[in-house]
């Protein structure tokens, strides 16, 4: 029955989208922890380019697990994914940091990747 195939396909797409969103959140959390431990790498206030940390760096330094590609298990989403941190004015003693996650998998690219 065609209906069953369509339902399964929609379910799989939803599961994949959830996996991508989870990876994006995990990447952001890993980058947050990385920069807590490496504050010297944080960008200057209002530097528009910010500082970039690669997913592979986060994996190599044990902040992040290997991210298997949900669409193709023989690939992963590690090599082209990264996080950019930018720094706005300090708020009291706290730094106002913004994290932009770029997750790149075989059939998915975060909207914040640009280009």
Regions found by a protein language model. Name each.
Residues 61, 73-115:
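Short, surface-exposed interaction loops/tails
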Residues 10, 14, 21, 25, ...:
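Context-gated lysine
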Residues 4, 23, 53-54:
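Generic detector of short, well-ordered, non-transmembrane alpha-helical segments enriched
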Residues 11-49:
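Conserved hydrophobic/amphipathic alpha-helical signal-anchor segments
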Residues 1-15:
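C-terminal juxtamembrane segment of a hydrophobic transmembrane alpha-helix
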Residues 9, 18-21, 32, 61, ...:
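Intrinsically disordered, low-complexity segments enriched in small/polar residues
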Residues 39-87:
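Extracellular/periplasmic head regions of type IV pilus-like filament subunits
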């Amino acid at each position: 029955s065609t209906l069953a195939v369509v339902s399964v396909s929609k379910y799989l797409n939803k599961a994949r989208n959830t996996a991508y969103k989870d990876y994006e959140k995990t990447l952001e959390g890993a980058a947050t922890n990385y920069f807590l431990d490496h504050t010297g790498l944080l960008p200057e206030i209002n530097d528009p380019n910010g500082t970039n940390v690669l997913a592979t760096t986060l994996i190599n330094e044990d902040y992040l697990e290997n991210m298997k590609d949900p669409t193709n298990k023989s690939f992963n989403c590690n090599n082209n994914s990264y996080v950019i941190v930018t720094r706005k004015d300090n708020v009291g003693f706290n730094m106002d940091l913004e994290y932009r996650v770029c997750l790149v998998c075989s059939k998915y690219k975060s909207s914040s990747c640009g280009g």
